[in-house]
Curated annotation (Swiss-Prot):
GO terms for molecular function: dUTP diphosphatase activity; magnesium ion binding. Signal peptide: none annotated. Its EC number is 3.6.1.23. This is Deoxyuridine 5'-triphosphate nucleotidohydrolase. Substrate binds at R71, S72, G73, N84, L88, I89, D90, M98. Belongs to the dUTPase family. It is an enzyme of class 3 (hydrolase). The keyword Metal-binding applies.
Length: 152
């Protein structure tokens, strides 16, 4: 059985004036989040702003979290990305989903009411347990890090 997450609608325009978040295709991982604004917001180059989504969430299950990610078209075409690059929503958070938007482009960008501004993906969570050790069991890779396997 598929797990369902309770997402509360805080703004009555969501589902009326602004469409409910949906998965675009059966293979979509992310839900589009929309700007729940009264009026358009002009974002100057280099500026950031917090934009409400009109949605609140309480995941409640500590084995799950959600991440907010930029929409690829906004970033590539207009330089519009998330101000914090990725937004993490912990399972015990209960507030409205706000999106930090950063205009890293060269031109002003206008965020229109109801515009799709980010996407949200639910992900499993594994918490680390720390154990003090003196050494690891050796592997073929060892301490090989950045670029250790070459480019081809």
């Amino acid at each position: 059985m598929m797990k369902k997450i309770d997402v509360k609608i805080l703004d009555p325009r969501v589902g009326q004036q602004f469409p409910l978040p949906t998965y675009a295709t059966s293979g979509s991982a992310g839900l589009d989040l929309r700007a729940c604004l009264d009026d358009a917001v002009e974002l100057a180059p280099g500026a950031t702003t917090l934009v409400p989504t009109g949605l609140a969430i309480h995941i409640a299950d500590p084995s799950l979290a959600a991440v907010m990610l930029p929409r690829s078209g906004l970033g590539h075409k207009h330089g519009i990305v998330l101000g914090n690059l990725v937004g993490l929503i912990d399972s015990d958070y209960q507030g409205q989903l706000m999106v930090s938007i950063w205009n890293r482009g060269q031109d002003s960008f206008t965020i229109e009411p109801g515009e799709r501004i980010a996407q949200m993906v639910f992900v499993p969570v594994v918490q680390a347990e720390f154990n003090l050790v003196e050494e690891f069991e050796a592997t073929d890779r060892g301490e090989g890090g950045f670029g250790h396997s070459g480019r081809k």
